[in-house]
């Protein structure tokens, strides 16, 4: 016999707004980490362009040499343009929007923005991106944020340099993205808390403790999962599993 019915309704609007604000603040934190290096990356081609202009103004260059200088200047400007566009696109706030996207292109966009960090941190990059992955139904901007956070964390974990390996592959109906570093590793005692909000193993002032929590939420929103394998003194591997999306013929 049914004696009554209890109904509970919760307005999740404020919660969703807070989640979005946290994601945006974490994205801005990543942009801050990138800014100085991106400025250096832009300054190099600009210096080359100024040098070309200086030599061309002398009026002593042969026509063929002038063409070489003009081509070099154009290449430098296009590189600056590409970097600025990528950074602006990454930093802007976007409404969540699922669409078919190439996960390998998402990986490469993140690597383009972080490329300038590898040499000064003595990090060797290795990639193995499978060409057999179908386009996935994802929010490209959110997945860029997840991968950006994991790449930046990996670089920070390799204090004396090391190898960063990024792999993509298919496992039956799922896409796997692996981000592996040869850094300091994570103690087994803190592994259960690694995705908790505000938990960080970094020194005070060097991390918000939100990056992995935000990444966890984004991957979950995509119907996927994120886990890690780590051993102190050996390194850490983050494994993202996303539902495969096969396009209709």
Language-model region placement:
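Sensory-domain boundary/capping and coupling elements
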Residues: 16-28, 33
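Short loop/turn elements at sensory-signaling interfaces that couple input to output
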Residues: 1-5
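Sensory beta-strand/linker motifs that couple input domains to effectors
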Residues: 8
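Core catalytic ATP-binding domain of two-component histidine kinases
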Residues: 13-14, 36-249
């Amino acid at each position: 016999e049914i004696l009554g019915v209890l109904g509970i309704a919760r307005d999740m609007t404020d919660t969703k707004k807070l989640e979005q604000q946290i994601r945006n603040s974490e994205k801005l934190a990543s942009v801050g980490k990138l800014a100085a290096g991106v400025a250096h990356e832009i300054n190099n081609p600009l210096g080359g362009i100024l040098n070309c202009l200086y030599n061309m103004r002398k009026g002593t260059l042969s026509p063929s040499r002038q063409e070489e200088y003009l081509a070099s200047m154009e290449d430098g400007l296009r590189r600056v343009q590409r970097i600025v566009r990528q950074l602006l696109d990454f930093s802007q706030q976007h409404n969540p929007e699922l669409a078919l996207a190439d996960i390998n292109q998402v990986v490469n966009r993140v690597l383009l923005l972080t490329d300038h960090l590898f040499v000064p941190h003595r990090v060797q990059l290795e990639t193995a991106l499978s060409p057999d992955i179908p386009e996935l139904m994802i929010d490209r901007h959110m997945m860029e944020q997840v991968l950006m956070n994991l790449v930046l964390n990996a670089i920070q974990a390799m204090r004396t340099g090391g190898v960063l390996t990024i792999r993509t592959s298919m496992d039956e109906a799922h896409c796997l993205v692996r981000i592996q570093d040869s850094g300091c590793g994570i103690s087994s005692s803190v592994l259960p808390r690694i995705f908790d909000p505000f938990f960080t193993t970094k020194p005070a002032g060097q991390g918000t403790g939100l990056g992995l929590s935000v990444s966890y939420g984004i991957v979950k929103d995509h119907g996927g999962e994120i886990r890690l394998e780590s051993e102190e003194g050996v390194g850490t591997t983050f494994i993202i599993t996303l539902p495969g999306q096969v396009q209709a013929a």
